[in-house]
Design a protein with these regions (language model features):
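Radical SAM enzyme [4Fe-4S]-AdoMet core and its adjacent flexible, acidic
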Residues: 2-7, 11-153, 157-163, 167-171, ...
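Flexible mid-to-C-terminal extensions adjoining Fe-S/redox cofactors in radical SAM and related proteins
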Residues: 141, 165-166, 170-278, 283
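Long, charge-rich, low-complexity alpha-helical segments
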Residues: 284-291
């Protein structure tokens, strides 16, 4: 806290002790997670819990979220599992034997459980890995899972390994350079451009009005399932399958302030980064937009 840390994201795989140990590959992991959360709360540090959903723990979402809320977590993320490249993932969209890829119906049930957590415990919810918007269909109901898109394709992300290797997505094996040998700017502007020039989008998404926000779901999951990026996300349904659009918050008070020519104050934590042809603006936490 004294160093300026104001937020921590922790993994919280399951309320079940044995299951939690198996997923984390660590003994007494649940107790350690709970102890860490309590320490953060005591010291005034915001903490969010992230539950990666597998077929093994999907039935414990509500109880795990309930525990996270009782411990003082600010937000509960339900995140799609990204299969490792060495795993034997199923090529079927609706396989019941696949550990990582849930069926469309199972995934919707998981999202509904998270919305129940939000309602019952007044807890903010979300996801760290995007869902294809054509799969969500009702963007107003599932608004908490809309808008993240793919930070890697948006140019908002770069991952640096402990050894200095540079990746775009945290789930990616390919290295584009090394921070100890190459300029970060050079790697970002040149080597990583294939992620930023729309070539990672699935061709079946062409013409969809939500493609700029969706970016064809998660291309690392697509790569794990199909063997390469720019392919179909397992939850893909089809372009323009959104049945209910996302409704923007219309705050009349903001328009009144504008009409009165009143001054706006910009947060001193706002950050800008000049790129080629655009500027990235980090509003707060992980919220970054291009202008």
């Amino acid at each position: 806290r004294e160093a300026g840390l104001d937020h921590i994201l922790t993994s919280f795989p399951s309320i079940d002790k044995k299951e939690n140990d198996y997923i984390m590959q660590s003994n007494n992991s649940l107790e350690k997670i709970m102890r860490g959360i309590k320490a953060c709360v005591r010291n005034g540090i915001r903490i969010s819990a992230n539950m990666v959903i597998l077929r093994a723990n999907m039935d414990k979402i509500y109880d795990t979220g309930k525990l996270a809320a009782s411990l003082g977590c600010d937000k509960f993320f339900i995140t799609r599992a990204v299969p490792p490249s060495y795993s034997e993932t199923s090529k079927s969209d609706n396989s019941t034997e696949d550990l990582y890829n849930l069926t469309h119906e199972e995934t919707k049930k998981c999202l509904d459980e998270v919305l129940r957590i939000k309602k019952d415990f007044k807890m903010r919810v979300g996801s760290l890995v995007s869902y294809p918007l054509c799969f969500l269909e009702d963007l107003d109901k599932y608004r908490d899972f809309v808008g993240r898109g793919c930070p890697s394709q948006s140019g908002h992300r770069m991952s640096i390994n402990a050894n200095g290797d540079l990746h775009v997505c945290v789930h990616e094996e390919e290295s584009y350079g090394n921070v100890f040998k190459t300029s970060i700017q050079e790697v970002y502007q040149n080597e990583m451009r294939t992620w930023h020039n729309k070539s990672k989008r699935y061709s079946g998404c062409k013409g969809c009005e939500y493609i700029e926000m969706c970016e064809s779901g998660c291309q690392m999951i697509s790569a794990a399932v199909n063997g390469e990026t720019a392919t179909k996300d397992p939850l893909y349904v089809g372009p323009n399958n959104v049945k209910k659009d996302f409704n923007l918050v219309d705050d009349k008070g903001i328009y009144d302030v504008i009409k009165k020519n009143e001054k706006f104050k910009v947060r001193n934590t706002l950050r800008f980064r000049q790129e080629k042809g655009f500027i990235l603006v980090n509003i707060r936490w992980g919220n970054t937009i291009s202008v």
